[in-house]
Curated annotation (Swiss-Prot):
Belongs to the DMRT family. InterPro entries: DMRT-C1/C2_C. This is Doublesex- and mab-3-related transcription factor C1. Transmembrane segments: none annotated. It comes from Rattus norvegicus (Rat).
Length: 225
């Protein structure tokens, strides 16, 4: 006699669970419809497809939870048929339908062309824009720097050459002054001393090859070596 009473109680519990599921589904639908009416005035027409997708997701999640509750009730009835009557306190607890309202930013991530939505589309585009190198159009920055280095080297070489010539001329002047003290002014020197003549002071020193240098410069170079 306890079996029919237990089955009736299980049926009543199942009917109560199904009624609560229906109420929750209607509440979810009403809430989604109200949200749609409120956002239709502000959002453009291009986002209608996005809103439809969000509504379909909410309905699918509700259906999945209903199927899970139905499976729990079926397992409870199978246990009752195999073990005897089941008390109402041991029935599976009714779970509410999970509903997570989505923000406008999450809705915008859905692609309008019908492709699967997700946040993976935007990050694939951003790195290509951020990592592009900036092109410089200044011609002065693009010129090679080899010419400046060669110019500096030539300038330093000419300065060293002029310093060497000045030092050699100073040595020759000292040598000639010491020789003129021992010799009269009108007496010409020997053939070796004639080569030790001072260069013209009006002419500036200039770098040249050994073949084109005058005898005074050659003597300067021999003194330096």
């Amino acid at each position: 006699m306890q079996r029919p009473s237990g089955s009736r109680e299980v049926r009543k519990a199942v009917s109560a669970v199904s009624a609560s599921k229906k109420e929750q589904a209607t509440r979810v639908k009403k809430h989604v419809v109200r949200r749609q009416k409120g956002t239709m005035a502000a959002a453009p027409k291009s986002h209608v497809h996005v809103k439809k997708l969000t509504v379909e997701e909410g309905v699918r999640t509700g259906k999945n939870s209903v199927h899970q509750l139905q499976a729990q009730v079926d397992t409870a009835t199978q246990q009752e048929s195999s073990q005897g009557p089941v008390l109402l306190s041991q029935l599976p607890e009714t779970t509410s339908v999970p509903y997570t309202p989505e923000t406008m930013g999450q809705q915008l991530t859905v692609s309008l062309s019908g492709e699967p939505y997700g946040p993976s589309a935007m990050p694939s585009m951003c790195p290509s824009l951020i990592l592009q190198p900036c092109a410089t159009t200044d011609p002065m920055l693009l010129q090679p720097q080899g010419s400046s280095a060669s110019n500096q080297a030539s300038v330093s070489a000419t300065l060293e050459w002029q310093e060497m010539l000045e030092a050699a001329e100073a040595l020759l002047a000292l040598k000639n002054s010491s020789q003129t003290r021992h010799q009269p002014c009108g007496m010409p020197g020997t053939a070796g001393e004639r080569g030790l003549q001072l260069p013209n002071p009006s002419m500036p020193p200039r770098p040249a090859s050994s073949g084109s240098l005058p005898s005074g410069h050659l003597d300067c170079m021999s003194l330096l070596t």
